[in-house]
Amino acid sequence: MSNVPAELKYSKEHEWLRKEADGTYTVGITEHAQELLGDMVFVDLPEVGATVSAGDDCAVAESVKAASDIYAPVSGEIVAVNDALSDSPELVNSEPYAGGWIFKIKASDESELESLLDATAYEALLEDE
């Protein structure tokens, strides 16, 4: 079974979300998602300053197997992207919850967090797949 850190929130589309000390949220794809995709070859990052709505596709992870859209788990403004992925997309595989993060977002409606899954609910989703 994939590693599912308890402190994160999760989307049904296999993104994770972590609240940072400055009030922004870091977003990436889960270990399960990167296992399904296989070795990353490119990550198309969103534009810093872009405004997105929850559920919008805002990035693309391209692997040796497929290209997969990455969705914004909450609405808000993209405030940072992980430029390290330009040279090292494999960080998504090796460190999905650390160095392989994809973007940071300043949430415009924190009530949307309530629709995300906690670790227990996400693990149950994985068991049903």
Swiss-Prot record:
Pfam families attached to this UniProt entry: GCV_H
Cofactor: (R)-lipoate
Domain (Lipoyl-binding) ranges: 24-106
Signal peptide extent: none
Swiss-Prot/TrEMBL keywords: Lipoyl
Superkingdom, natural source: Bacteria
InterPro entries: 2-oxoA_DH_lipoyl-BS, Biotin_lipoyl, GCV_H, GCV_H/Fam206, GCV_H_sub, Single_hybrid_motif
GO cellular component: cytoplasm; cytosol; glycine cleavage complex
Modified residues (N6-lipoyllysine): K65
GO BP annotations, alphabetical order: glycine decarboxylation via glycine cleavage system; one-carbon metabolic process
Xref: PROSITE patterns: BIOTINYL_LIPOYL, LIPOYL
SUPFAM superfamilies: Single hybrid motif
Keyword Disulfide bond: no
Free-text remark on how the cofactor is bound: Binds 1 lipoyl cofactor covalently.
Keyword Lipid metabolism in annotation: no
Function field: The glycine cleavage system catalyzes the degradation of glycine. The H protein shuttles the methylamine group of glycine from the P protein to the T protein.
Annotated HAMAP family: GcvH (MF_00272)
PANTHER family attached to this UniProt entry: GLYCINE CLEAVAGE SYSTEM H PROTEIN, GLYCINE CLEAVAGE SYSTEM H PROTEIN-RELATED
Subunit structure: The glycine cleavage system is composed of four proteins: P, T, L and H.
Family from the record: Belongs to the GcvH family.
Protein name: Glycine cleavage system H protein
Organism whose genome encodes this protein: Escherichia coli (strain K12)
